[in-house]
Amino acid sequence: MAKEKIIGIDLGTTNSVVAILEDKTPRVLENPNGKRTTPSVVSFKNDDIIVGEVAKRQLETNINTIASIKRKMGTSETVKINDKEYKPEEISAMILSYLKDYAEKKIGSKIKKAVITVPAYFNNAQREATKTAGRIAGLSVERIINEPTAAALAFGLDKTDKEQKILVYDLGGGTFDVSVLELANGTFEVLSTSGDNFLGGDDWDNEIVKWLIGKIKLEHKYDVSKDKMAMARLKEEAEKAKINLSTTSTTSINLPFLAVTDSGPINVEVELKRSDFEKMTQHLVERTRKPVRDALKEAKLKSEDLHEVLLVGGSTRIPAVQEMLQHELNKKPNHSINPDEVVAIGAAIQGAVLSGDINDVLLLDVTPLTLGIETQGGIATPLIQRNTTIPTTKSQIFSTAADNQSEVTINVVQGERQMAADNKSLGQFNLGGIEKAPRGTPQIEVSFSIDVNGIIKVSATDKKTNKIQTITIENSTSLTEEEIKKMIDDAEKNKEADAKKKEKIDVTVRAETLINQLEKTIKDQGDKIDPKEKEQTEKEITNIKDLILQDKIDELKIKLDQIEEVAKAFAQKAASKETSKNEQNEDGSIDAEIKEEDPKA
């Protein structure tokens, strides 16, 4: 009987990737668009849920589109769509379900199990939320592993006979982690981990966005930050500019008709130099330096002890990031693996280990933060120190703080601060029925255990009566079992109907994007367009709208193929006439263009 496959999923802030091991060789699975990475974006349109490339294209036009939901995992925040509130786990489940569906089509069999990666610095609530998202998507999450650990697995799969110490620098879309691992005799042991859950490639994009907002305000006296659609376009162009500046010294940012004011349309055309980009983001690069030093210190290593420095996450392509790291560690980072795919590949390898397809690899991960309980005076008393190898169990005896105390409250905290209030409370429970006695007399054993997924269980036992109270620390904001079951059932019920809707959604989105472009051109440039062309275009818009209303998808596809190229030429012609007019003065003369170099540009 064939072993059941376990896929590996990198559920990223910006993009997600799914991989599998076939014949002991990792394979990244392409999505329906032929891409190996899928945007972690979900869009709601009427009753339809759209994920990935098509959803990302709607960021500009559809306010019911959600990106970077990973930043909210493990929190009580919700997103409101059409009068319904969704928890982060639900949105993430939609992404996971999409990945699962196309993976099944690629390998030709059902998938029930997955290994999902999380940032090393994800706390317990965030890990539980990730497991919950997997369950809603119909996946049994066999293991949650840290992203840097997964990267090291991918790098070291064919090097298990060599003893090496590896530093993994993982700069994702929304999180940043550094881990130090030791590889020896097929064992991958995490020695330390450090990072920042609120730093990622998005922050580099945002610096460009802020720069553009300032330029537009200065030149056009318009605050574009209050225009949602314009901001979506700015963010998309900022990301493109960041990517371009990794390989070129200068990039152009062109945003025609970004907005329309009383003075006319705002057209943005600026150049951004890599040197200026590096100045505006230098503070972000510097924020990554301390976690690198902390991880080495925790591992009791120096930079010269490292054999390899691995780069993970698309933003590690930024030259300033690589230069800082090389200068800090006096070692050139390893570029041999694709930073966008390596985490999913590592997760797939761990899946193969769990399924028995790989037998000579052992992964020993660590807990990223100290765990303890609140004791008298609000002190955080640690039981399991950060960077302890998991799974692990630790017990300690405590007592009462007052005479004749019959009940104690156990407040479980996570963090490195001395006072419990300064750390994150993961949950609390009461142990009652304690026999009356002077303070300090009763013996209460508190035990912590952390499993391989980093999920925590805590128990308190009265040693005299053997009365015990146990809690599994779960995300205090997570969904109830009933809610999770309902969502799983709903997802299964709607699966066939959703599949039938997919083609309709893709074609309709294409059509509506085209309509928006044409209507905007007519609205902004109508007086400059030939009346016959304008009339013909308006008729075509009406025809397309009618086909959408009548659900005539096949006819709509044919119509779109015919008109898209015509529409492009139509928009270019209108823009050309506007440019010609703007270059003329009122007396009919045309000024020569004079460029003045802006030292801040």
UniProtKB/Swiss-Prot annotation:
<comment type="function">
    <text>Acts as a chaperone.</text>
</comment>
<dbReference type="Pfam" id="PF00012">
    <property type="entry name" value="HSP70"/>
</dbReference>
<comment type="similarity">
    <text>Belongs to the heat shock protein 70 family.</text>
</comment>
<dbReference type="InterPro" id="IPR012725">
    <property type="entry name" value="Chaperone_DnaK"/>
</dbReference>
<feature type="compositionally biased region" description="Acidic residues">
    <location>
        <begin position="585"/>
        <end position="601"/>
    </location>
</feature>
<protein>
    <recommendedName>
        <fullName>Chaperone protein DnaK</fullName>
    </recommendedName>
</protein>
<dbReference type="GO" id="GO:0005524">
    <property type="term" value="F:ATP binding"/>
</dbReference>
<keyword id="KW-0143">Chaperone</keyword>
<feature type="region of interest" description="Disordered">
    <location>
        <begin position="570"/>
        <end position="601"/>
    </location>
</feature>
<dbReference type="GO" id="GO:0051082">
    <property type="term" value="F:unfolded protein binding"/>
</dbReference>
<keyword id="KW-0346">Stress response</keyword>
<keyword id="KW-0067">ATP-binding</keyword>
<feature type="compositionally biased region" description="Basic and acidic residues">
    <location>
        <begin position="575"/>
        <end position="584"/>
    </location>
</feature>
<dbReference type="InterPro" id="IPR018181">
    <property type="entry name" value="Heat_shock_70_CS"/>
</dbReference>
<dbReference type="InterPro" id="IPR043129">
    <property type="entry name" value="ATPase_NBD"/>
</dbReference>
<keyword id="KW-0547">Nucleotide-binding</keyword>
<dbReference type="InterPro" id="IPR013126">
    <property type="entry name" value="Hsp_70_fam"/>
</dbReference>
<dbReference type="GO" id="GO:0140662">
    <property type="term" value="F:ATP-dependent protein folding chaperone"/>
</dbReference>
<keyword id="KW-0597">Phosphoprotein</keyword>
<dbReference type="InterPro" id="IPR029047">
    <property type="entry name" value="HSP70_peptide-bd_sf"/>
</dbReference>
<dbReference type="InterPro" id="IPR029048">
    <property type="entry name" value="HSP70_C_sf"/>
</dbReference>
<feature type="modified residue" description="Phosphothreonine; by autocatalysis">
    <location>
        <position position="175"/>
    </location>
</feature>
